[in-house]
Amino acid sequence: MNAALRKWHRAVTLLPALSVYDETAQRVFTAAYDRRHKSFEDWLTAIAQLPLIEPRAVHLNQAVVTAEGAGDEIAIETLLKALMPWRKGPFSLCGVSLDCEWRSDFKYQRLLDAGFSVSGKKVLDVGTGNGYFLYRFLGSGAQCAVGVDPSWLYFAQFLALQKFFQQNRAVYLPTTLDDLSLEGFDCVLAMGVLYHRRDPLAFLAQLRNAVVCGGDLVIETLVVDGDAQTVYMPKQEYVGMHNVWFLPSIAALCRWLERLNFRIELCSEAVETTINEQRRTRWVNSFSLADFLQRAPSAPPPKRAFVIAKRL
């Protein structure tokens, strides 16, 4: 719990407006710690065994987020494997190549190619995973980058990454917006989260509350073909995920956002997810996209798109 509270206090330092939630945050993190993953202490032990590293150089503004430095590569790799599976990346940590399941740099490059900028902004990443995008935001000039995600494994992975990157302007809060309301961000992103929510409109409203008037919301999600009335709901699982509820068309997603008083700034083309972007690596001890596609060949192929909208 101390690690979570330290991250919260860092967030308040970066965003003083969050101080009004301080009492709530104390309760939220205490309750969350009581429900923590049974292996969390084991993960913390592994992280503590990582040597204190003074990186020679840190490179955040590139596909492979890199910390250059000298270290025992075998020991580093062994300890990082204790935190598997690694989903978002890639990273290079003192010579150890952390080739994660997702080439998250593909997604970020699509945003950059569309002219997306976080330079000088306070950024919130909802469903941040292990924090890969937090580092990319800082590399792109963000004033600060705060991530929320309820996964204690991802939180442990972020704590491990921070041993290498040591970025005080990157903050991870192991919680959700359901439990801890946040506000005052210039840009809020939710990438790969919307389809996990049973009430997507309520979730979009939560995101709206987190972004300042005139600020930007970025929604990146699985989509289907169709008009503004088209939404697909899987019968059970979808590409290996049991917690997938609503996959809108791009037009339907825009309609939802407009109803919530956003102005659509940009809609991307839908891009099919391939095994070049999501695949099994030696850092993932589970199935991946290629396996899931074989299980349900009749389901709509996974395609992703993003919408950038401005809060009015």
Curated annotation (Swiss-Prot):
Catalytic activity: carboxy-S-adenosyl-L-methionine + 5-hydroxyuridine(34) in tRNA = 5-carboxymethoxyuridine(34) in tRNA + S-adenosyl-L-homocysteine + H(+)
Enzyme Commission numbers on file: 2.5.1.-
Keyword match Repeat: no
CDD domains cross-referenced by the UniProt entry: AdoMet_MTases
GO terms, molecular function: methyltransferase activity; transferase activity, transferring alkyl or aryl (other than methyl) groups
GO biological process, one term: tRNA wobble uridine modification
Enzyme class: transferase
Binding-site residues, carboxy-S-adenosyl-L-methionine: K88, W102, K107, G127, D149, P150, S151, L177, D178, M191, Y195, R304
Alphabetically ordered keywords of this record: Transferase, tRNA processing
InterPro entries, alphabetized: CmoB, Mo5U34_MeTrfas-like, SAM-dependent_MTases_sf
Keyword Repeat: no
Cited NCBIfam families: PRK15068.1 (NF011650), tRNA 5-methoxyuridine(34)/uridine 5-oxyacetic acid(34) synthase CmoB (TIGR00452)
Assembly, per entry: Homotetramer.
Family to which the UniProt record says this protein belongs: Belongs to the class I-like SAM-binding methyltransferase superfamily. CmoB family.
HAMAP family found in the cross-reference section: tRNA_carboxymethyltr_CmoB
Function comment: Catalyzes carboxymethyl transfer from carboxy-S-adenosyl-L-methionine (Cx-SAM) to 5-hydroxyuridine (ho5U) to form 5-carboxymethoxyuridine (cmo5U) at position 34 in tRNAs.
Protein name as catalogued: tRNA U34 carboxymethyltransferase
The encoding gene: cmoB
